[in-house]
Amino acid sequence: MINFEATELRLGLPGGNHGGEMAGKNNGKRGFSETVDLKLNLSSTAMDSVSKVDLENMKEKVVKPPAKAQVVGWPPVRSFRKNVMSGQKPTTGDATEGNDKTSGSSGATSSASACATVAYVKVSMDGAPYLRKIDLKLYKTYQDLSNALSKMFSSFTIGNYGPQGMKDFMNESKLIDLLNGSDYVPTYEDKDGDWMLVGDVPWEMFVDSCKRIRIMKGSEAIGLAPRALEKCKNRS
């Protein structure tokens, strides 16, 4: 029979034999596989090194929880003393809060008492382009108030009540004389919203009931005299 292997055409160097070619093929295959294995080993080694570095970095980034506050001292404080000291802290806070409440209440009381010691009212005058504000608590009598108003509005003529007319209730004759002899007369608005002549009630009652003062012309205040006398009689 014909030996096909012997007659098979092969590419190779002259003088080469089949065994050498097979050996070359085998050697070539082994060289490729070894190269692939070497690359795989290198890549796995690199991955292992990278993973180790990442793990170390992650460990460094992890922040440890802060340690609990402990009582520091020398000699060392025992555990039961620590518990006693920690239990006393809320008591100190409660005492501070109580002091704050006490100071707040005392401040409110002082502000209320300060408001009770002053009685500010606005003062206006017919024809005057400005307003004034006075504290009625600063004056003791109607005469003191009249003198103060005369100084505030010095360019206007305000009726002079005299030392006797301001102490007690003013009678009808005094009111009429006052309105007829003065260009301007001081009046006030009481708590009821009525306009009255200044001097129709005792000074303490006037300070408590006065909301504002208006110095109006005497001709416009004539109608206030009978009403003031009638209201004074009703109060008495």
UniProtKB/Swiss-Prot annotation:
Signal peptide: none annotated. It is found in: Nucleus. A motif (EAR-like (transcriptional repression)) lies at residues 9-13. Induction: By auxin. SUPFAM superfamilies: CAD & PB1 domains. It comes from the Eukaryota. Keywords: Auxin signaling pathway, Nucleus, Repressor, Transcription, Transcription regulation. Residues 82-110 are annotated as: Disordered. Aux/IAA proteins are short-lived transcriptional factors that function as repressors of early auxin response genes at low auxin concentrations. Repression is thought to result from the interaction with auxin response factors (ARFs), proteins that bind to the auxin-responsive promoter element (AuxRE). Formation of heterodimers with ARF proteins may alter their ability to modulate early auxin response genes expression. Homodimers and heterodimers. This is Auxin-responsive protein IAA16. It comes from Arabidopsis thaliana (Mouse-ear cress).
